[in-house]
Design a protein with these regions (language model features):
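Extracytoplasmic/secreted envelope proteins and their assembly/folding machinery
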Residues: 22, 26-33, 67, 71-74, ...
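VWA/integrin I-like adhesion module and closely mimicked acidic/polar interface patches used
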Residues: 75-77, 106-161
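Loop/turn elements at helix/coil->beta-strand transitions in domains of secreted/extracellular proteins
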Residues: 2-3, 38-42, 95-100, 124-130, ...
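Residues that scaffold, gate, or flank divalent-cation-dependent active/transport sites
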Residues: 9
Length: 165
């Protein structure tokens, strides 16, 4: 792919009072961005009940200056509020990326069948969706909405046990 969107949950459960997964998500993002070259484009959407965009609602070039501005953007984020996974994923699909990464603890509310179908239709088979879930201990669910979302959109699911970090 040449264009990437990273959709990162910043709801209360991702913060220091919960999993402290927001900082782990930032590390995952840093690693991913380090792989990009200047011809790649990216966007980051941090969400709770509503999305916040970096740099705005368009793509940014993967140049060092934008990576530095992204660090500043993350520095200003706090984990609070509820979670609207569908709104955030649909916002990420609006810029028609080749690849979308969803990074979340997968907390309720999960995406239901209607919402999963809506995401798949919006993606139109043009965007690969990878899901990275953060949790404590072994993965509890064998068929979470995140596993379905990845499988139905050509992507992969990855689980990060925060106790092993």
């Amino acid at each position: 792919g040449r264009s990437f969107v990273f959709v990162i949950d910043r709801s209360k459960s991702m913060g220091g009072q919960g999993l402290n997964a927001l900082s782990a998500a930032q590390k995952q993002l840093d690693r991913a961005l380090a792989e990009l070259v200047e011809t790649h484009q990216f966007q980051v959407i941090a969400y709770h009940d509503k999305p916040v965009y970096f740099p705005n609602r368009t793509m940014a070039k993967a140049v060092p200056g934008n990576r530095q501005r992204l660090k500043e953007f993350f520095g200003g984020l706090a984990a609070f509020g509820g979670t609207n996974h569908e709104l955030a994923v649909l916002a990420g699909l609006r810029v028609k990326p080749d690849v979308l990464f969803l990074l979340t603890d997968g907390a309720s509310p999960e995406l239901n069948r209607v919402q999963l179908d809506r995401v798949r239709r919006r993606s139109g088979g043009l965007t690969t969706i990878h899901c990275i879930q953060f949790g404590f201990g072994p993965l509890q669910e064998q068929t979470s909405f995140m596993q379905k979302l990845a499988a139905e959109n050509g992507g992969q699911f990855h689980y990060v046990d925060m106790r092993k970090r």
